[in-house]
Amino acid sequence: MKVVTVRTVVVAGAVCLGASAAAAQVVKQEVPGIRNFAKVESTVACAGAITADAVPAVKKMGYAAIINLRLATETGADIEGHTAAAKAAGIQYIHIPFSAANPDPAAVDVFLKAITTPGVAPAFIH
């Protein structure tokens, strides 16, 4: 249990430090169908919930992959619709369910592996 806790704390700390360092580089944009779009750097953008209709716009912006951290049980998550839209648009779609209320260290490991896989960057994370 201690290893899991330490790993989670280290990852959370790294994310916070990275976010702080990158804060000056964050570019926010208004994109139809995408809430709170923020380009963190040339290889990563983050946003709130998106609609399946917004997936082609993500591809058009040059992203190679969409990493969806929403739980399938969330209102409006529409994992199947997003998967189909990504396939139609020719963009990779990676669904890693993550609960902020009950974080799973295994999901963190899956995310870290996904984000470092060649061909995934630039990645759009929501």
Model segments located where?
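Bacterial N-terminal signal peptides that target proteins for export
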Residues: 1-10
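Cys-dependent protein tyrosine phosphatase-like superfamily
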Residues: 7, 18-123
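Hydrophobic helical h-region of N-terminal Sec-dependent signal peptides
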Residues: 11-15
